[in-house]
A protein has these predicted regions:
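Homeobox/homeodomain signature
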Residues: 5-8, 18, 24, 34, ...
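Catalytic strand-loop segment that frames the active site of acyl-thioester-processing enzymes
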Residues: 1-43
């Protein structure tokens, strides 16, 4: 199996759309002043938005969403608007994928990421 990867540059519009679709209107995802008041650099992308993109890449690598059985990851870093993250999946043995999500600075934003498929 070849390596599958997708590069995504996060935008305020994308983060807002995810907030509306998911119902997660936590102000750290929508209000820069609030986010800074709690020690964040500003608005950050939802972890589950990132995981959803990673799951999409894993599904493609597994041969379709119906083949994906499990996906694991740890939310390890913040993604801010303007950050570009490369999400990737590659073979890790029969029915297993190693997954990565790395920003433009080379920092892993999702770690301990893997998937199982049938």
């Amino acid at each position: 199996m070849k390596r599958i990867q997708r590069e995504v540059t996060f935008s305020i519009a994308q983060i807002d759309a995810y907030a509306d679709a998911s119902g997660d209107h936590n102000p750290i995802h929508r209000d820069g002043d609030f986010a800074r008041s709690v020690g964040l650099p500003g608005v950050i992308a939802h972890g589950l938005l990132q995981m959803g993109i990673l799951a999409s890449v894993a599904s493609e690598a597994a041969g379709g969403a119906g083949r994906l059985r499990r996906i694991y990851c740890r939310f390890a870093g913040m993604v801010e608007p303007g950050d570009t993250v490369t999400f990737a999946a590659e073979d890790a043995g029969p029915g297993k994928l190693m997954l990565t999500a790395v920003n433009q600075r080379g920092d892993a934003v999702l770690t301990k990421a893997s998937a199982e498929y049938r």
